[in-house]
Amino acid sequence: MNAIWIAVAAVSLLGLAFGAILGYASRRFAVEDDPVVEKIDEILPQSQCGQCGYPGCRPYAEAISCNGEKINRCAPGGEAVMLKIAELLNVEPQPLDGEAPELTPARMVAVIDENNCIGCTKCIQACPVDAIVGATRAMHTVMSDLCTGCNLCVDPCPTHCISLQPVAETPDSWKWDLNTIPVRIIPVEHHA
Protein backbone atom coordinates (compact mmCIF):
# COMPACT_ATOMS: atom_id res chain seq x y z
CA MET A 1 0.00 0.00 0.00
CA ASN A 2 2.88 2.30 0.82
CA ALA A 3 4.38 1.76 -2.67
CA ILE A 4 1.13 2.89 -4.29
CA TRP A 5 1.19 6.19 -2.39
CA ILE A 6 4.82 6.74 -3.32
CA ALA A 7 4.00 6.11 -7.00
CA VAL A 8 0.98 8.46 -6.87
CA ALA A 9 3.08 11.18 -5.22
CA ALA A 10 5.91 10.72 -7.73
CA VAL A 11 3.56 10.94 -10.73
CA SER A 12 1.82 13.98 -9.21
CA LEU A 13 5.15 15.74 -8.64
CA LEU A 14 6.24 14.93 -12.20
CA GLY A 15 2.95 16.29 -13.56
CA LEU A 16 3.31 19.45 -11.48
CA ALA A 17 6.92 19.94 -12.60
CA PHE A 18 6.15 19.40 -16.29
CA GLY A 19 3.09 21.66 -16.02
CA ALA A 20 5.21 24.42 -14.52
CA ILE A 21 7.84 23.99 -17.25
CA LEU A 22 5.20 24.12 -20.00
CA GLY A 23 3.55 27.16 -18.42
CA TYR A 24 6.86 28.99 -18.24
CA ALA A 25 7.78 28.02 -21.82
CA SER A 26 4.41 29.16 -23.18
CA ARG A 27 4.93 32.62 -21.72
CA ARG A 28 8.65 32.89 -22.36
CA PHE A 29 8.50 31.78 -26.00
CA ALA A 30 5.08 33.19 -26.91
CA VAL A 31 4.77 34.67 -30.39
CA GLU A 32 2.90 37.96 -30.52
CA ASP A 33 0.28 38.23 -33.27
CA ASP A 34 0.49 41.18 -35.61
CA PRO A 35 -2.45 43.50 -34.78
CA VAL A 36 -2.71 44.59 -38.42
CA VAL A 37 -3.17 40.95 -39.49
CA GLU A 38 -5.91 40.60 -36.86
CA LYS A 39 -7.73 43.70 -38.13
CA ILE A 40 -7.49 42.61 -41.78
CA ASP A 41 -8.70 39.13 -40.83
CA GLU A 42 -11.72 40.66 -39.07
CA ILE A 43 -12.59 42.63 -42.22
CA LEU A 44 -12.38 39.61 -44.55
CA PRO A 45 -15.65 37.64 -44.95
CA GLN A 46 -14.25 34.37 -43.51
CA SER A 47 -15.68 32.30 -46.35
CA GLN A 48 -12.36 30.37 -46.62
CA CYS A 49 -13.11 29.88 -50.33
CA GLY A 50 -9.55 30.14 -51.66
CA GLN A 51 -10.52 32.35 -54.62
CA CYS A 52 -7.76 34.78 -53.63
CA GLY A 53 -5.11 32.09 -54.14
CA TYR A 54 -4.59 31.44 -50.43
CA PRO A 55 -6.05 28.52 -48.43
CA GLY A 56 -8.15 30.81 -46.26
CA CYS A 57 -8.80 34.32 -45.04
CA ARG A 58 -6.11 34.29 -42.33
CA PRO A 59 -3.23 33.40 -44.72
CA TYR A 60 -4.46 36.08 -47.14
CA ALA A 61 -4.52 38.63 -44.30
CA GLU A 62 -0.95 37.66 -43.38
CA ALA A 63 0.14 38.00 -47.01
CA ILE A 64 -1.41 41.47 -47.25
CA SER A 65 0.23 42.64 -44.04
CA CYS A 66 3.63 40.95 -44.25
CA ASN A 67 4.28 40.32 -47.95
CA GLY A 68 2.59 43.33 -49.52
CA GLU A 69 -0.01 41.24 -51.37
CA LYS A 70 -2.69 43.12 -53.35
CA ILE A 71 -5.77 44.05 -51.35
CA ASN A 72 -8.17 43.41 -54.23
CA ARG A 73 -8.21 39.61 -54.48
CA CYS A 74 -11.16 38.76 -52.20
CA ALA A 75 -14.01 37.88 -54.58
CA PRO A 76 -16.70 37.11 -51.95
CA GLY A 77 -15.98 40.33 -50.06
CA GLY A 78 -15.94 42.37 -53.23
CA GLU A 79 -15.43 46.09 -53.37
CA ALA A 80 -16.71 46.77 -49.84
CA VAL A 81 -14.00 44.62 -48.22
CA MET A 82 -11.31 46.04 -50.51
CA LEU A 83 -12.30 49.60 -49.56
CA LYS A 84 -12.21 48.79 -45.82
CA ILE A 85 -8.74 47.23 -46.13
CA ALA A 86 -7.53 50.21 -48.18
CA GLU A 87 -8.80 52.56 -45.48
CA LEU A 88 -7.14 50.49 -42.73
CA LEU A 89 -3.77 50.39 -44.50
CA ASN A 90 -3.99 53.95 -45.90
CA VAL A 91 -3.42 52.76 -49.45
CA GLU A 92 -5.13 53.65 -52.70
CA PRO A 93 -8.20 51.51 -53.55
CA GLN A 94 -7.73 49.26 -56.59
CA PRO A 95 -10.17 47.67 -59.02
CA LEU A 96 -11.01 44.10 -58.05
CA ASP A 97 -8.47 41.55 -59.27
CA GLY A 98 -9.42 40.04 -62.61
CA GLU A 99 -12.24 42.51 -63.05
CA ALA A 100 -12.22 44.40 -66.30
CA PRO A 101 -13.83 47.80 -65.92
CA GLU A 102 -16.32 47.14 -68.74
CA LEU A 103 -16.95 43.45 -68.17
CA THR A 104 -17.75 42.38 -64.62
CA PRO A 105 -18.40 38.66 -64.10
CA ALA A 106 -21.93 37.89 -62.98
CA ARG A 107 -22.42 37.10 -59.31
CA MET A 108 -23.11 33.39 -58.91
CA VAL A 109 -25.27 31.67 -56.32
CA ALA A 110 -25.71 27.97 -55.54
CA VAL A 111 -29.06 26.43 -56.45
CA ILE A 112 -30.20 23.02 -55.22
CA ASP A 113 -32.49 20.85 -57.34
CA GLU A 114 -34.70 19.90 -54.42
CA ASN A 115 -36.34 17.01 -56.30
CA ASN A 116 -33.00 15.17 -56.45
CA CYS A 117 -31.69 16.16 -53.00
CA ILE A 118 -31.37 13.14 -50.68
CA GLY A 119 -30.67 15.21 -47.55
CA CYS A 120 -27.15 13.90 -46.88
CA THR A 121 -26.03 17.28 -45.35
CA LYS A 122 -22.63 17.17 -47.10
CA CYS A 123 -23.34 20.54 -48.70
CA ILE A 124 -24.26 22.05 -45.32
CA GLN A 125 -20.96 20.83 -43.87
CA ALA A 126 -19.01 22.23 -46.84
CA CYS A 127 -20.63 25.68 -46.84
CA PRO A 128 -18.29 28.13 -45.05
CA VAL A 129 -20.97 30.81 -44.57
CA ASP A 130 -23.93 28.60 -43.51
CA ALA A 131 -26.01 29.65 -46.49
CA ILE A 132 -27.59 26.19 -46.88
CA VAL A 133 -30.41 25.10 -44.58
CA GLY A 134 -31.97 21.70 -44.16
CA ALA A 135 -31.88 18.60 -42.00
CA THR A 136 -30.73 15.02 -42.39
CA ARG A 137 -32.90 13.19 -44.93
CA ALA A 138 -34.87 16.36 -45.58
CA MET A 139 -34.85 18.81 -48.45
CA HIS A 140 -32.11 21.47 -48.43
CA THR A 141 -32.24 24.95 -49.85
CA VAL A 142 -29.81 27.84 -50.34
CA MET A 143 -30.38 31.29 -48.85
CA SER A 144 -29.28 33.30 -51.86
CA ASP A 145 -28.67 36.47 -49.83
CA LEU A 146 -25.96 34.68 -47.82
CA CYS A 147 -24.42 32.58 -50.61
CA THR A 148 -21.03 33.86 -51.80
CA GLY A 149 -20.86 31.59 -54.86
CA CYS A 150 -17.62 30.01 -53.67
CA ASN A 151 -18.45 26.63 -55.32
CA LEU A 152 -17.38 24.59 -52.25
CA CYS A 153 -20.77 22.87 -51.92
CA VAL A 154 -20.94 21.55 -55.50
CA ASP A 155 -18.30 18.79 -55.41
CA PRO A 156 -19.34 17.06 -52.13
CA CYS A 157 -22.91 16.51 -53.40
CA PRO A 158 -23.30 12.78 -54.24
CA THR A 159 -26.36 13.34 -56.47
CA HIS A 160 -24.91 16.39 -58.27
CA CYS A 161 -28.08 18.37 -57.62
CA ILE A 162 -26.23 21.63 -56.82
CA SER A 163 -25.25 24.06 -59.54
CA LEU A 164 -24.05 27.64 -59.64
CA GLN A 165 -26.30 30.03 -61.49
CA PRO A 166 -25.93 33.76 -62.12
CA VAL A 167 -28.01 36.06 -59.96
CA ALA A 168 -30.65 37.92 -61.93
CA GLU A 169 -30.00 41.62 -62.27
CA THR A 170 -32.41 43.88 -60.44
CA PRO A 171 -32.38 47.67 -60.08
CA ASP A 172 -30.92 47.15 -56.60
CA SER A 173 -28.04 44.92 -57.75
CA TRP A 174 -27.30 46.74 -61.01
CA LYS A 175 -23.97 48.57 -61.07
CA TRP A 176 -24.84 51.95 -62.46
CA ASP A 177 -21.98 53.58 -64.31
CA LEU A 178 -22.80 57.19 -63.66
CA ASN A 179 -19.76 58.41 -65.58
CA THR A 180 -21.16 57.25 -68.93
CA ILE A 181 -24.70 58.52 -68.48
CA PRO A 182 -24.99 61.67 -70.58
CA VAL A 183 -25.80 64.63 -68.39
CA ARG A 184 -26.90 67.87 -69.91
CA ILE A 185 -27.12 71.05 -67.92
CA ILE A 186 -30.17 73.01 -68.89
CA PRO A 187 -29.85 76.71 -68.21
CA VAL A 188 -32.70 78.17 -66.24
CA GLU A 189 -34.05 81.45 -67.47
CA HIS A 190 -35.84 83.68 -65.06
CA HIS A 191 -38.64 85.76 -66.54
CA ALA A 192 -40.23 88.47 -64.55
UniProtKB/Swiss-Prot annotation:
GO terms for cellular component: plasma membrane. It comes from the Bacteria. Residues 32-91 form the 4Fe-4S domain. [4Fe-4S] cluster 3 binds at C127, C147, C150, C153. Its main location: membrane. Residues 1-26 are annotated as: Hydrophobic. Its cofactor is [4Fe-4S] cluster. One of its GO terms (molecular function) is metal ion binding. InterPro entries: 4Fe-4S_dom, 4Fe4S_Fe-S-bd, 4Fe4S_Fe_S_CS, 4Fe4S_Ferredoxin_RnfB, Elect_transpt_cplx_RnfB/RsxB, RnfB/RsxB_Proteobac. NCBIfam families: PRK05113.1, rnfB. HAMAP family: RsxB_RnfB (MF_00463). Belongs to the 4Fe4S bacterial-type ferredoxin family. RnfB subfamily. PANTHER family: ION-TRANSLOCATING OXIDOREDUCTASE COMPLEX SUBUNIT B (PTHR43560:SF1). The complex is composed of six subunits: RsxA, RsxB, RsxC, RsxD, RsxE and RsxG. This is Ion-translocating oxidoreductase complex subunit B. The gene is rsxB.
